[in-house]
């Protein structure tokens, strides 16, 4: 117990330190924390919070970190006094209890990883941490020194939130100087995952290393590909390839040795999960996996189509559950970077080659378009821009990440492409969704290098280089203007989308670099 004195908890009944999967499973059952499914996967309910609470996330405003953090709606400030008050409250909640302490690494690169200690009173949350982060060896555990501590007091709420000037009784707070995070009021496991991701996005760029919200895989010849894309763009599907090993599906770093996964597991959506279309994920759901907010049938089988608790049903599992993964969780420098956008306006080409400067522009834009249904059944695509394809998790000014990306693209001579997995031949409602076959053909041409031998032409207004012909893709598809029957509607929609890009980018022009990068977007 003595080695846990620095946690600041009183009268702890018992500490369960780095339990095995079997031990955690036994505790989950004894504590009545959930149910076992027909194939012995444990299943929990995260309560009223079935997703992250971005409006309840804060950073303590103090020097020196305050001069690096980009304060605003994403990174909200909180005072040191209020942090101390809520940390004390969280520690009181965890005191006098049996607690679980789970130690893990974030980052598969020895030079870049961080050692994180998680403290919770819930066995399944320790299980989630064990699944999602990198599991230290026995020797590493014996010499473990935490760089950062997360207190997860999910049962603790802040009743005084109104007088404290906060958004709700939930709080997720990061103190960079003290290397502590405290979570209260939400049971959602993803807060721990994305919380440490946010911290990696603070630490690494200040060490001149890039942190990225992307998936990564590696080919038989050691060629690495990164896939960036917002939800619904096909990132998981397209980075899963029988001929390539998965490095990771969500969070990566890029240091002077190459690309490395931050995590030791995957956190996959399970709504409408189908063994035929997503056999890898389906096959990964077995003992040691942890299901969240799914509905069980009477025979304890999972009804993946049931969204009665939430659309955001999830499963976490150790990456070893994916057969075709890269065991070291790292590889060399990328050969190709692919930005995925599901453009529901039907304007972006199926594939475009980007210059280094354009890559920085489209990385900062982080564009996709969602289809939003309205009450009267009229559907109008909604443009979504998320800086660096992961804005909610980026504490620094987005241009910091873009500059690092540009430097690495240049240094390691990386090819960058923009791939549209969205609509063609018209906007949503008129055009049709790009076939997965055509998209796969574009991805394959990028990965096998054949696209570099193509003849390219200019795609007007957006000033993108697009191939004139590509094996496996109808030539008419390659330039969107050829797929629209109504050319006036095409021109109008193209100009409208270009204008959205330009308007969105104005928010980066508060710094010199942003003004510089803005020159590489659409010309209107």
Swiss-Prot record:
InterPro entries associated with the record: PEP_carboxykinase_ATP (IPR001272), PEP_carboxykinase_C (IPR013035), PEP_carboxykinase_N (IPR008210), PEPCK_ATP_CS (IPR015994)
Which reaction(s) does the protein catalyse, per the Swiss-Prot or TrEMBL entry? oxaloacetate + ATP = phosphoenolpyruvate + ADP + CO2
Q: Name one GO molecular function term.
A: metal ion binding
- Give the SUPFAM superfamilies listed for this entry: PEP carboxykinase N-terminal domain (SSF68923), PEP carboxykinase-like (SSF53795)
Query: Where in or outside the cell is it found?
Result: Cytoplasm
Amino-acid positions noted as binding substrate in the UniProt annotation, renumbered to this chain:
52, 188, 194, 314
Q: Which cofactor does it need?
A: Mn(2+)
Chief subcellular location equals cytoplasm
What remark does the entry make about the cofactor? Binds 1 Mn(2+) ion per subunit.
Annotated positions binding Mn(2+): 194, 213, 250
Write out the entry's keywords from A to Z.
ATP-binding, Cytoplasm, Decarboxylase, Gluconeogenesis, Lyase, Manganese, Metal-binding, Nucleotide-binding
Q: What is its EC number?
A: 4.1.1.49
Q: From which residue to which does any coiled coil extend? A: none
UniProt GO BP? gluconeogenesis
Give Gene Ontology CC terms.
cytosol
Query: Which cysteines are disulphide-bonded?
Result: none
Family annotation (CDD domains): PEPCK_ATP
This protein's pathway reads: Carbohydrate biosynthesis; gluconeogenesis
List residues binding ATP.
194, 213, 229-237, 278, 314, 439
Tell me, in a sentence or two, what this protein's role is.
Involved in the gluconeogenesis. Catalyzes the conversion of oxaloacetate (OAA) to phosphoenolpyruvate (PEP) through direct phosphoryl transfer between the nucleoside triphosphate and OAA.
Q: Which family does it belong to?
A: Belongs to the phosphoenolpyruvate carboxykinase (ATP) family.
Quote the protein name from its UniProt record. Phosphoenolpyruvate carboxykinase (ATP)
Which species is listed as the source? Campylobacter jejuni subsp. doylei (strain ATCC BAA-1458 / RM4099 / 269.97)
